[in-house]
C-alpha cells in the first residue's frame, strides 16, 4: 500500500527541514507513520491478512529505530516531532 504522490508531497512540505529534504529523520518518520496508519486501517477490515501484519510490524520497528536515533541526536527535534505526529512517548 504505497502512498500516492500528492499525499507524499504534502507530508514532505510539512515536515521537511529544507527545500527538497526527503531524508531527514522527521520526514522519514512522518512517511512511515502515514503508512502505518493506512496499514492499520487495512488490517481492521482484513483481520487474517498476516502478510500485511508482518509488514506493519517491520514498519513500526523501522520507525522506532529512527525515533531512537533522533532522540539521541537532538532531543528537542524528537519531542517536537512526536508532538506534531501525535505519537505516544
UniProtKB/Swiss-Prot annotation:
Part of the 30S ribosomal subunit. Forms a bridge to the 50S subunit in the 70S ribosome, contacting the 23S rRNA. Keywords: Ribonucleoprotein, Ribosomal protein, RNA-binding, rRNA-binding. GO terms for biological process: translation. It comes from the Bacteria. PANTHER family: RIBOSOMAL PROTEIN S15, BACTERIAL AND ORGANELLAR, SMALL RIBOSOMAL SUBUNIT PROTEIN US15M. Gene3D superfamilies: 6.10.250.3130, S15/NS1, RNA-binding. It comes from Acidothermus cellulolyticus (strain ATCC 43068 / DSM 8971 / 11B). NCBIfam families: S15_bact (TIGR00952). The keyword Ribosomal protein applies. One of its GO terms (cellular component) is cytosolic small ribosomal subunit. CDD domains: Ribosomal_S15p_S13e (cd00353). This is Small ribosomal subunit protein uS15. It holds the Pfam family Ribosomal_S15. The gene is rpsO. One of the primary rRNA binding proteins, it binds directly to 16S rRNA where it helps nucleate assembly of the platform of the 30S subunit by binding and bridging several RNA helices of the 16S rRNA.
Amino acid at each position: 500500500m504505497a502512498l500516492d504522490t500528492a499525499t507524499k508531497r504534502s507530508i514532505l512540505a510539512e515536515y521537511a527541514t529544507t527545500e527538497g529534504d526527503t531524508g531527514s529523520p522527521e520526514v522519514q518518520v512522518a512517511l512511515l507513520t502515514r503508512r502505518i496508519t493506512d496499514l492499520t486501517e487495512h488490517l481492521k477490515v482484513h483481520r487474517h491478512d498476516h502478510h500485511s501484519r508482518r509488514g506493519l510490524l517491520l514498519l513500526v520497528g523501522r520507525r522506532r529505530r529512527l525515533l531512537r536515533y533522533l532522540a539521541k541526536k537532538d532531543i528537542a527535534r524528537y519531542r517536537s516531532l512526536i508532538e506534531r505526529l501525535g505519537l505516544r512517548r
